[in-house]
Amino acid sequence: AALTIREKSDASIIIAEKANIKRSGCLAAGVNAINAYIVEGRKPEDYVEYAKKDADDIVREDLLLTMSERLNEVTAKMEKLGLVILKDENGRYVARGNRNIKINGENIKPILADAVNSLENVIVINRLNITDYIVKDNTILGAVGFNIDTGEAYEIRAKKVLCATGGAAGLYKPNNPGFSRHKMWYPPFNTGAGFAMGINAGAEMTTFEMRFIALRCKDTIAPTGTIAQGVGAKQVNSLGEVYENRYGLTTSQRVYGTVRENIEGRGPCYLRTEGISSEQDESLKKAYLNMAPSQTLKWIESGKNPSEQNVEIEGTEPYIVGGHTASGYWVDTNRRTTINGLYAAGDVAGGCPQK
């Protein structure tokens, strides 16, 4: 947001970040694909239809369309900043399915941080936890917070405020117990603070009952799409049966089917990787190093490649996350909330899943 504002105005900008913008929040460890992209031969309306179907029509189509129309523009900006997007021998982006392109994105957050730190008249305050908005007569005046190391209080006055604090993890018992309880899909430090601040200030919110449960590789909680789309792996039960078509192929149906198979005694469930080529083995191990290195380490520690052993899968605990569901602030197509001068983006913005 700071980069775009600087392109269009000379406004003074303050970024308040609870951790450090170089490695914080979602994608802090990187990502191996841009999962929202209009690939060659597709159009923004196709992405809208996909998101609608995946969310059982619980969406705002106006928000989906205005987002979809700018996905490729934002991706092009990231490439100019230094993000490596994989290309084929003809120089075209390497697609992964109908909506994704492959990248080497371990450093996606440092790239953005370096770009922001090079801007004039932009102040980045790391380790500052914003706790409340300053609002009068339904108009934003700024925000207050505390340094998480020293406890020093901050009051920031601003004509406009953009909330991008992420969704809410930690609402449910995690898959992994004890010291591994933070080995989860969604960042444990995304606590829903942005939602709470909006509610306290009287902003209209939407669809909090829509929770997201991710289908992930067991134990490592690594993404499954890298395997399912990358090598065409099917979901199979302990009997070797492909069960995914029995329940449906939307995000929620894939998770529901896995849960049902386990309940009915046909678990554990897997992504069928046995028999893939050695080249695909290496491709998967490299891909996970860009996003979830624990999965690659698990293969190495076991002494078995994906081609020698199927990958067990499970659902995570539920999260409130507007990037995958429609939960969050009620916004218009300019991402303005119902509080004058307050905007919402990313996982705190409602109505627009599949961001």
Features from the language model and the residues they span:
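Mobile, glycine/GP-rich and aromatic-enriched active-site lid/loop segments adjacent to catalytic centers
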Residues: 72, 79-131, 139, 207-355
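Glycine-rich active-site loop/strand segments that organize a redox cofactor
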Residues: 35-67
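Short acidic, glycine/proline-rich loop/turn micro-motifs
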Residues: 27, 173-178, 353-355
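Glycine-rich FAD pyrophosphate-binding loop
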Residues: 6-31, 41
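Glycine-rich loop(s) and the adjacent beta-strand/alpha-helix scaffold that form part
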Residues: 163-222
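Core beta-strand elements of the Rossmann-like FAD/NAD(P) dinucleotide-binding domain
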Residues: 149-160, 337-341
